[in-house]
């Protein structure tokens, strides 16, 4: 069934292709991107798709310029984590030892992070783990190691102000070389410590088209601006602002383009038509802005925004996503934005810059397109693919199938639907321990304990634990019996030893005359009596 539908779709496309020989799309400028898992609570929706100006409007173009930033769309850096790893020995007076391990989060110092970062770059940074226990009798002793860990972490860049932007930063942005995060035990350090002058950034040439009603008097409220980076910018919400010594205007989305004071429309100077921007106005980028902040009141953009939010609702409910759902999350106009894909069942995103490209149709035999203009040279627009069921998937739902390379959003726009566009796949956000709550500080007061890893707590069990095998127990029994017999023998022999030690005594009433020596002195009659 699927193959027959695919064949019919390809046949249908073959008839439609001549009518759409130059299909204009907004697509990532690089053929490969650096993908990261989408974390929970992410609901970024880009600015709506490009508007088509009314046929009755007169269009004129003028050469302008826009800052592209002194840094790329993302900046390399490192997260520095600090914790105290503690081994506690509770040595009781009656014998047992209680050994516990715990981890305590602490705020790293600048010197600790610099030292650890130098070791990390040289490949000598190691985690010592828990220290060995140090036990003192009848006391509680702590042994601790200060463990500093370094992990690479890329952040976005606000091209205009030179600020780093990331959900981990407090408030979502940072302009220092040592940035606090929502986790008190972690700080972010940029890989390049050099401070850049904002006005030292490059300004790229840009052709801006201005549309107006030629039947009415030219005023700011009746002007619409358009460029390859700006889809539909209303003059009514545009103001005049000097930036780095250049005259220019700031669009409603916060982006700035130069506008020469000599530029005219129907012999009327364009720059004075706009009012001055309020004092303290900053030039901003909308890359990290929330979808609700860039949503305008025009009905053409409400649909895109609703479809995008509906897709995030599916992600939140952990429902499977189709390639068409992914296309709703992507930017529809040139400029900085985010691209989405599915990698091993995980919804992933990447920072990118969308550029205008022209393709032969919504279904291609090869992933090739023309840049700069419809008359340009065709080149590969994408080379990075991931497994997606029986097919492969690229950015924003772009499918690599047996029937060709399909762009779901553009196929639906032409009323072409097939089963492959609705192929479902698990695409859940990653449960990362660092959830992006940029407006609050994460609670790092919790301490991690690994429980009692010491010896027995019972003195009786402690004694019986001395004998770990039956041989030792038998030997102990024999020794005990011998000791008892020895003690009994000593007690029995003690009276005998005491008797032999006594001295002889003379009997009372025995005269010494009975001795042999005295008999010779006795008379005979006395001897006879004796």
Swiss-Prot record:
Top-rank taxon, per record: Viruses
Cystine pairs: 45-308, 80-113, 89-135, 174-179, 199-244, 239-277
Region annotated Fusion peptide, chain positions: 58-177
Gene3D superfamilies the UniProt entry points to: 2.30.29.130, 2.30.30.640
S-palmitoyl cysteine lipid attachment residues: 498
Effect ascribed to mutating residue 502 to K: In strain: Isolate CIN0360R and Isolate CIN0360V
Topological domain spans for side Virion surface: 22-473
Phenotype when changing residue 128 to P: In strain: Isolate CIN0309R, Isolate CIN0318R, Isolate CIN0327M, Isolate CIN0327R, Isolate CIN0331M, Isolate CIN0360R, Isolate CIN0360V and Isolate CIN6514V
Complexes and interactors: Homotrimer. Interacts with host LDL at target cell surface. Interacts with host Vim; this interaction might facilitate the binding of the virus to the cells.
Protein known as: Glycoprotein
Natural source organism: Chandipura virus (strain I653514) (CHPV)
